[in-house]
Amino acid sequence: MRTLLIMAVLLLGVEGSLLQLRKMIKKMTNKEPILSYSKYGCNCGMAGRGKPVDATDTCCSIHNCCYGKVTSCSTKWDSYSYSWENGDIVCDEKHPCKDVCECDKAVATCFRDNLDTYKKRNIFHPTSSCVKVSTPC
């Protein structure tokens, strides 16, 4: 249900963190994030937390932990400011939601750097086979 809500918001064109994250991932990986990552492995999207199935899923685990440390802004709805320089994301140092931007930059870069571990079979990885991790962060 939450995935459908997120997709609906993205389709409305709201300029918030989720849309900005989508744009970063799309540009870095050339993959449509909603289709490629929203249900990937044990940690991407709304799948929850568990032992990562591969390096791509580890990117999501790290991203979840990063979001858990953000206190100043909404990780889903508040927008931030960033630019592209030589194919890299540069977060605006002075923006109040810079921490959210840095989390999103890290996961988009991680996805790009681990494209060789991405497996289509992990898109709908059954959560029942995810091994819970007592301290994921």
Swiss-Prot record:
* InterPro entries in alphabetical order: PLipase_A2, PLipase_A2_Asp_AS, PLipase_A2_dom, PLipase_A2_dom_sf, PLipase_A2_His_AS
Q: Does the keyword Disulfide bond apply?
A: yes
Gene Ontology CC annotations of this record: extracellular region
Tell me which domain of life the UniProt entry assigns to the organism this sequence originates from. Eukaryota
- In which broad location class does this protein mainly occur, judging by the first location in its UniProt entry? secreted
Tissues showing expression? Expressed by the venom gland.
Q: Which cysteines are joined by disulfide bonds?
A: 42-130, 44-60, 59-110, 65-137, 66-103, 73-97, 91-101
Family according to the record: Belongs to the phospholipase A2 family. Group II subfamily. N49 sub-subfamily.
> Protein name, please?
Basic phospholipase A2 homolog CTs-R6
Question: What taxonomic classification does the UniProt entry list for its organism?
Answer: Eukaryota, Metazoa, Chordata, Craniata, Vertebrata
